[in-house]
């Protein structure tokens, strides 16, 4: 079992986290638009996407710890 993570792997995980954070920001913007438009179905969809991405981010952060 490897007790350490290579620099390349850490950078890859960091890039994945950055990508998820950007997508999460995008969904937060779409959520705000849906709330202003009163589209409850779209609001729920965006909330679900934000939550999914947050779970993925947490999993990746655990890998780095």
Task: Give each language-model segment a name.
Residues 1-5, 62-65:
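Short intrinsically disordered terminal tails
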Residues 18, 22-65:
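Short, charge-rich amphipathic interface segments used for partner binding and complex assembly
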Residues 2-22, 42:
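Short, charge/polar-rich alpha-helical segments
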